[in-house]
Amino acid sequence: MPSHFLSNSSSIPTSNPSDSAIAAGSGSDSQNDALSLTSSFSSSSASRLSEMWSYMWIPFLISLSKELSLAKAQSEIFLPTELERDSSSRCSPPESRLNYQPVIGILSHPGDGASGRLSNASTASYIAASYVKFVESAGARVIPLIYNEPTDILFQKLDLVNGVLFTGGWCKSGLYYEVVERIFKKILERNDAGDHFPLYAICLGFELISMIITKDRRILERFNAADMASTLQFTKDFNLEGTVFQRFPPDLLKKLSTDCLAMQKHRYGISPEKFQKNQYLSRFFQVLTTCKDEDDKDYVSTLQAHNYPVTAFQWHPEKNSFEWGYPTIPHTEDAIQVTQHVANFLVSEARKSLNRPSPQKVLDNLIYNYSPTYCGKAGRGYDEVYIFTRSSL
């Protein structure tokens, strides 16, 4: 036992001095060995004890830390009844002056949109589904304005919408021209009366309202842009505010002038020179963009009315996202963003309309009451069209 090795030497019996000396020497060695062993044993035991306590403390400290964190988190969570204010007031209400269920009227065009492959009825008219999807993608619904239905019915439907879209096509005469002219004048009258009633005129729509405003059916010039994608070149000192381009991100605006993101599908247009010389056009519109055709000739491509929410496009913003019949249509992410921003502007303008028609009358006339026809298998033209004939009116 350690107590034996550390006992006093006087308790050990001796016989003679020499033996005592030997015993003393031997005892000294034994004491040194005992002290060394004791020190080693004590050091080892202390080390193991320290390690044992470390292993015991680590999980305890982790557990304690978690409990403290949880307690702190719980102390920062308040029930609505514990707050002095109503938590529902955190969501600001939408602007009451805006209409969050806007409806756009799209005017149908003579024919079936497929050169008679779908319907050769003389009373047939159509709306390409890409225009419908274009409007719906921005948060509005569509009522078809069937151009050859009775006038009173057509204008009753016009009273149900918050904006109008004139589509592309080919017809520039007869009943169709007359209906476009009457609707265009009605749009201006509604705006003059205080309603904010937007119009998008795309391709043929651009051409028709140019003819109507100038009262000149020969105002159009020939261009070679029947199937191509192009850039848009913005005019000098162009002010974005209040135009279709006002919410475009700066990088996308830049790409519009460097990348071919605008689909062209037309043979007619107006040169910048002719536009400037025509006082009717220059007084009504400002030029936002121009383009070059395949022969490097410039034509006006985007117009914005000075005093009305009227925008005219001599290019096709709807095709990038919703038409697949031509390989020249751009489908890049940037091209899709162009389509979306242009659609968003039309619907944002329509939300400002004061017109609040009967909800039931709107439901009775929505394009959901008709079914589109798939015609994309032909590999050209539109992918889908809505066809209207006398039997469906």
Write out the residue ranges for each language-model feature.
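N-terminal beta1-alpha1 cap of cysteine-dependent amidohydrolase-like domains
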Residues: 2-8, 13, 24-25, 29, ...
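Short linear segments in intrinsically disordered or otherwise low-structure-confidence regions
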Residues: 16-18
